[in-house]
Amino acid sequence: MILLYIQNRWIISFLFIVSSLLVVLGLTIYKNEKTVDLSDVEINHLKLNETFDNSEYSLNKHVKLDRYVFYNHNKYKNLTIKVKKKHHKIKGIILVKDTVVNTNFDVHIGDQIDAVIDNLGYNYDKDKVGKGYDALVYLDKDHHMKLSILYKDNIVKRIEFFSR
């Protein structure tokens, strides 16, 4: 009986040490993740988590989700806004093809990818996306935002900006 008690104590001690090391490792990885303040980023004068004014937008009936509704700009058809139904807050902005839509970080569709890095900095993760596209992904852990700049042949093709 005493031998069984000693073995259990060693097993419990070992499990405690392993779980402690895993927690420390996880916290270290989380702390060292790159983060950028994206709270001031605007696309077509729209910010995430602001109340949405749909006066210049038409409802996109092709995309249907339970908690969200999507709008397309009347003038810029490739500018799509994802809006939370309950609070009517902007939760996503997607821009494709329209080269004239403004961003406050001075990047447009068709610009060189170097312009993105010059204006937003080097705290990004590089990612491969389907059909030969690459992406620069900027994360804002404090505000729970993610800005993805998709590019092909060093030319910006798509801008996606989402919030939780």
Regions found by a protein language model. Give the residues of each.
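Acidic/proline-rich low-complexity IDRs
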Residues: 2-3, 45-47
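Sec-dependent signal peptide cleavage junction
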Residues: 24-41
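N-terminal Lys/Arg-rich, disordered targeting/topogenic segments
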Residues: 1-9
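Hydrophobic membrane-insertion alpha-helices, especially the h-region
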Residues: 10-28
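A cross-family detector of function-defining hotspots
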Residues: 35-40, 47-89, 99, 108-164
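N-terminal glycine/threonine-rich, aromatic-flanked beta-hairpin/loop signature
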Residues: 94-96
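N-proximal short alpha-helices
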Residues: 28, 89-90
